[in-house]
Amino acid sequence: MKILITRPLQQSRRFAKALDKQFGESLEICISPVLEIKFFRVEINLKPFDGLIFTSESGVKAFAHLNKKTDKKVYCVGAYTSEVARRSGLSVSHTEKDVGDL
């Protein structure tokens, strides 16, 4: 089976490695990133919000790039997003496998 992965390069490589580990040589993997994540400096006023929801590692990294510290409740979609959030110093209140369960 041939698989095309279009995520950003670093994420593509990690995903390809996981696929290779699970399926071995039965997959032919082609990595062809169609986007690159760039972080911008923006001002965010968190005061009116009760919590933050992160749906991807890129969202967590973008928030961390702002050097924001928060005591807001943090909700994550996916175990890996939650792991990245914790490594970034966020206190994760709740994690679900998809947004529908969150």
What is the meaning of each model-derived region?
Residues 1-102:
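Signature of uroporphyrinogen-III synthase
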